[in-house]
């Protein structure tokens, strides 16, 4: 797909995050589960998929004809960065054909000392035709990432960094601020649990939105039900 085709495909739509980490119930060594989630999402009208690991991305692209936002989650000593942290992971994601490559775009440094903006600039220099999304937490980091060449900025890390501790719900004001001030296209992601919140995120100015836990993580979904029930006993 061309960049314009990808933009037209995902604009105003739902991108479903299909991920299972090793400690989660839907994880298997062989894979095969996340492609089924992606098929269900596609059948339900999703406009794209967000996926983690080359294995899952490759399997998903074999069964759905939707743009894929690809990441590789990996912990590194000495840094809180864990979403597509090094150029090695970038190389792997580009090689497997991700449509949009997502990286963590917060204020911490990568293991080699690079800022998020420096890392994105290096990606764009190496892969000038690759669409890049920065998973951000605040306006300063989003603007820096967009200035470095990020095509999309996501609200993915809002509430998950020391600078944004205590934000445990969708920050519609932040989405609106990004839409006003940031030149990159805004992807609302994180803390979106209901269709009503999804619609409100689009009204706030999001170009598109990503939902994962409320759709593809049954343990989280069930936990919300049981917590609500137990609170009313």
What are these regions (language model features)?
Residues 1-95, 126-132, 140-147:
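Conserved N-terminal beta1-alpha1 strand-loop-helix module at the mouth
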Residues 1-3, 21-23, 172-233:
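Alpha/beta catalytic cores of nucleotide-metabolism and tRNA/nucleoside-modifying enzymes
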Residues 19-21, 43, 72-77, 96-110, ...:
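Glycine-rich phosphate-binding active-site loops on the catalytic face of alpha/beta enzymes
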Residues 28-29, 50-69, 80-87, 105-123, ...:
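Active-site-adjacent beta->alpha loops and helix N-cap segments on the catalytic face
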Residues 47-48, 67, 99-100, 131, ...:
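Residue-level detector of anion-binding/catalytic polar loops
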Residues 78-93, 137-149, 184, 188, ...:
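Catalytic cores of alpha/beta
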